[in-house]
Every structure is written in structure tokens, then in C-alpha cells.
């Protein structure tokens, strides 16, 4: 069992592991964050060129090194802090405590991915404009990806079982909606801090449409009109 401070819930259901493994194309170099005891790592290794397994827990990393075949490269470190190896695909049962920052880092690499995340986060990723779940994370990820929720997972498929349901999500890269993602993130962070205000009140337009009702395309249009590398969102 992993350290609780890293919010690790290990996949224990082999049928779910098989389902996820079958979503990953064969013969690729794979980055896996949070491999734990290797529930996904080992079956993925059978069909992949190389697995770069990034594990923050040194004890789990040593365990995996003893169990894994030669094409699994175990990297001990914080996936949020280190530079990732060059790879073709990303897989992760993402630790709950780092879900949003890890997804945002993944977006910078633009790797195709299959991730397991909290169901509520998955609902945010596919949320429609004008709904409560729609927000900055929705916009940031869909700037780079088409998002599909493929399967809902009950708590008992993990050990220890989390208190919430999870979801298997496929992220397919699309043409980025902007060139400078860092600036776009700063813009959307400021914009969604006033998510219920109208564009008229924010002096970003003449419409009474509220921030959380804007489509991705409308947000990109605002970004290009009102924001560059030296200024912040006008409010």
C-alpha cells in the first residue's frame, strides 16, 4: 500500500487493467505516472517498446524494479517537477491530489493519453458551456484534446477504495486552440475567477453573456483580442 499523503489508490481489478491496456496501441514508448505495484505497467510492458514508469514513492519504485521486465524504466521522482522522457503515449491512474496540475502538464506535451481520474473531474472535462462543471480546466484541456469518458469505475476496483467513483478517460490530441498555452492559462485563470460576471461588466464586450456561458471558441477570440505577453485580462 502506498503512502496516503500521495493519495494513491492502487488498481486491483485485472479486468479493468485489461480494458485500459487494450486502449493503448502496441509498440510505443509509454510514460506512466504513478505505476504503484504495476497493475498496468506489467501488462503494458508486454505490448510496448518501453515503459517509463515515474513513481514518487521510493519503496514502490524499488518493488516495481524487482518485478518489471527489462523494457520498464523506473524513474523515481515527482512527475510534476521532472522533465518527462520523449514518448508516444501517456497512461496514468492519476493520484487524486495532483489531478489538475498533472493534466495541465500533460497538455503541454500533447501526448495521446488514457487516464483514470475522479468521476467529478471527468465530468468537468466534458462539461458544456453554461453548466456548473464548466470552467478553466475544461477549457484548458479541450484547447488541446478531444475528450471521451469511456468507463465509470466503482471504488472497490481500487485498494484502498476511494470515497468517490472514478472514470477512464481518453484524450486525443487536436490542433491547439492557441500558440502560447502559458499565457492562455493565465488569461483563463483571471477570466474564470469572475465566472458569473457578464462580458459587459468586465468590459470585454457588449453582451450580457456570462463567463461560464462562453464556448471555447469565444474564449479564444477574447484572448486574442484582449491579451498578449505583456498585459493581463482587462477587468
Curated annotation (Swiss-Prot):
Kindly give the PROSITE patterns that the UniProt entry links to this protein: RRNA_A_DIMETH (PS01131), SAM_RNA_A_N6_MT (PS51689)
- Molecular-function annotations in GO: RNA binding; rRNA (adenine-N6,N6-)-dimethyltransferase activity
Against SMART domains, the record matches this protein to: rADc
Q: Where in the cell is it found?
A: Cytoplasm
Q: Name one GO cellular component term.
A: cytoplasm
Q: Which Pfam families match?
A: RrnaAD (PF00398)
CDD domains in UniProt: AdoMet_MTases
Q: What keywords are assigned to this protein?
A: Cytoplasm, Methyltransferase, RNA-binding, rRNA processing, S-adenosyl-L-methionine, Transferase
EC numbers for this chain: 2.1.1.-
Give the binding site residues for S-adenosyl-L-methionine: 9, 11, 34, 55, 78, 93
Q: Which InterPro entries match?
A: KsgA/Erm, rRNA_Ade_Mease_Trfase_CS, rRNA_Ade_methylase_Trfase_N, rRNA_adenine_dimethylase, SAM-dependent_MTases_sf
Q: Name where it mostly resides.
A: cytoplasm
If you read the UniProt record, what top EC class would you report for this enzyme, in one word?
A: transferase
SUPFAM superfamilies from the xrefs? S-adenosyl-L-methionine-dependent methyltransferases
Family assignment? Belongs to the class I-like SAM-binding methyltransferase superfamily. rRNA adenine N(6)-methyltransferase family. RsmA subfamily.
According to its UniProt entry, what is the function of this protein? Specifically dimethylates two adjacent adenosines in the loop of a conserved hairpin near the 3'-end of 16S rRNA in the 30S particle. May play a critical role in biogenesis of 30S subunits.
The UniProt entry, under PANTHER family, shows: DIMETHYLADENOSINE TRANSFERASE, DIMETHYLADENOSINE TRANSFERASE-RELATED
What's the name of the protein?
A: Probable ribosomal RNA small subunit methyltransferase A
Q: Which organism is it from?
A: Pyrobaculum islandicum (strain DSM 4184 / JCM 9189 / GEO3)
Amino acid at each position: 500500500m502506498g503512502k496516503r499523503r500521495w493519495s494513491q489508490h492502487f488498481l486491483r481489478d485485472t479486468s479493468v487493467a485489461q480494458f485500459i491496456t487494450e486502449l493503448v496501441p502496441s509498440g510505443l514508448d509509454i510514460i506512466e505516472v504513478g505505476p504503484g505495484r504495476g497493475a498496468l505497467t506489467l501488462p503494458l510492458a508486454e505490448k510496448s517498446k518501453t515503459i517509463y514508469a515515474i513513481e514518487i514513492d521510493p519503496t514502490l519504485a524499488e518493488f516495481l524494479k524487482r518485478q518489471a521486465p527489462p523494457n520498464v524504466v523506473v524513474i523515481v521522482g515527482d512527475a510534476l517537477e521532472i522533465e518527462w522522457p520523449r514518448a508516444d503515449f501517456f497512461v496514468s491512474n492519476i493520484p487524486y491530489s495532483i489531478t489538475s496540475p498533472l493534466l495541465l502538464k500533460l497538455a503541454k506535451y500533447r501526448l495521446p493519453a488514457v487516464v483514470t481520474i475522479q468521476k467529478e473531474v471527468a465530468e468537468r472535462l466534458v462539461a458544456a458551456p453554461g453548466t456548473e462543471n464548466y470552467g478553466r480546466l475544461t477549457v484548458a484541456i479541450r484547447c488541446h484534446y478531444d475528450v471521451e469518458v469511456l468507463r465509470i469505475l466503482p471504488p472497490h476496483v481500487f485498494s484502498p477504495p476511494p470515497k468517490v467513483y472514478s472514470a477512464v478517460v481518453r484524450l486525443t490530441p487536436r490542433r491547439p486552440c492557441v500558440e502560447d498555452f502559458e499565457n492562455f492559462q493565465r488569461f483563463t485563470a483571471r477570466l474564470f475567477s469572475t465566472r458569473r460576471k457578464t462580458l459587459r461588466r468586465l468590459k470585454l464586450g457588449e453582451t450580457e453573456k456570462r463567463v461560464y456561458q462562453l464556448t471555447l471558441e469565444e474564449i479564444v477570440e477574447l484572448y486574442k483580442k484582449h491579451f498578449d505577453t505583456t498585459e493581463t485580462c482587462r477587468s
